Curated annotation (Swiss-Prot):
Lineage: Eukaryota, Viridiplantae, Streptophyta, Embryophyta, Tracheophyta
NCBIfam families per record: PRK04191.1 (NF003219), uS3_euk_arch (TIGR01008)
Record's protein name: Small ribosomal subunit protein uS3y
Keyword tags: Phosphoprotein, Ribonucleoprotein, Ribosomal protein, RNA-binding
GO BP term, pick one: translation
Annotated GO MF terms: mRNA binding; structural constituent of ribosome
InterPro entries found in the cross-reference section: KH_dom-like_a/b (IPR015946), KH_dom_type_2 (IPR004044), KH_sf_prok-type (IPR009019), Ribosomal_S3_C_sf (IPR036419), Ribosomal_uS3_C (IPR001351), Ribosomal_uS3_euk/arc (IPR005703)
PROSITE patterns noted in UniProt: KH_TYPE_2 (PS50823)
Domain spans labelled KH type-2: 21-92
Entries under PANTHER family matching the protein: 30S/40S RIBOSOMAL PROTEIN S3, SMALL RIBOSOMAL SUBUNIT PROTEIN US3X-RELATED
Superkingdom of origin organism: Eukaryota
Amino acid sequence: MTTQISKKRKFVADGVFYAELNEVLTRELAEDGYSGVEVRVTPMRTEIIIRATRTQNVLGEKGRRIRELTSLVQKRFKFPVDSVELYAEKVNNRGLCAIAQAESLRYKLLGGLAVRRACYGVLRFVMESGAKGCEVIVSGKLRAARAKSMKFKDGYMVSSGQPTKEYIDSAVRHVLLRQGVLGIKVKVMLDWDPKGISGPKTPLPDVVIIHSPKEEEAIYAPAQVAAPAALVADAPLTAVDYPAMIPVA
């Protein structure tokens, strides 16, 4: 017998499940370019789509790793047998994915690269991938003992209103270094795409589009036709105007 729960509890339970699933996959697949997860619930089963830049590593040899992840999710969240299925989807343009860029910056800093050089590298790569704007913030003990924050920006970036929900992709990561923990925040502003492939379909509300004027058809003056002499005042009548005037032999 299924238990009935209110809509409020259902939304809260779905949110907690998504947050915990995202946390588990972030820890498991951080090195494989994990870029988010999507959950689709159907009457027959629950489909979990994992987005990553290196899908071959997510699948593993002969699909071994994806089966292990399926078993882990099934046991952790108490799904019935064969009721959950995991899929791997490749990120088309990782330069426009904030999560992928935050992870990339994290591994650059762990590798010992200078903060300024690593941030400018991410900034350049994002802008070359077709983004409208990018912002990278790194905060913590960067050089001295006192913590501070460094911000790197390029392009156009909106910070309020509905466009922030549609155009801005953001990600936050933390990296543990010898001097302490650094916080990484990456924001990518997508460009408008009428097809909705690389950006949102809805244009920005403050963008004015000036359409080119339509080409008007050329209007030609009517051709002037000589009027017959009968219609012209003070003109002599001829046999052409009145055939009855033609003399009969």
